[in-house]
């Protein structure tokens, strides 16, 4: 794995999840771009039923993820972590992952890299 960069103006804020004590808070124009060489990438995010939890559009190498928008507001959310395979397992290569918040607050808890 080779990290090239993580570019964001999003603040890191404390969370009450013991496994993920801090998170990047994506909202408004504070998105995130990750450049790395990997075989697979998991993106962990927080879900909750509170109305301020929003959504985030994700593209990988310029192509929308399927589904293209992750919703962190869920009637089943209670501050728990969920994940999405932003880069599904495959051959190792350089990837650019872009996260653009579309509404509300979106908390990125961590990255799983292989």
Label each PLM-derived region with a short phrase.
Residues 15-36, 51-56, 80-84:
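Short beta-strands within extracellular/lumenal beta-sheet-rich domains
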Residues 46-114:
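Beta-strand-rich ligand-recognition modules
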Residues 6-16:
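Extracellular glycan-recognition surfaces and repeat-rich motifs
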């Amino acid at each position: 794995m080779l990290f090239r960069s993580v570019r964001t103006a999003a603040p890191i804020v404390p969370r009450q999840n013991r496994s993920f004590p801090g998170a990047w808070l994506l909202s408004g124009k504070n998105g995130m771009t990750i450049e790395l060489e990997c075989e697979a990438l998991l993106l962990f995010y927080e879900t909750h039923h509170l109305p301020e939890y929003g959504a985030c559009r994700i593209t990988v190498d310029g192509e929308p993820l399927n589904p293209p928008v992750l919703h962190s507001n869920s009637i089943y959310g209670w501050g728990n972590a969920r994940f999405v395979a932003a880069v599904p397992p495959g051959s190792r290569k350089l990837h650019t992952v872009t996260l653009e918040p579309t509404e509300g607050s979106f908390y990125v808890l961590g990255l799983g890299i292989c």
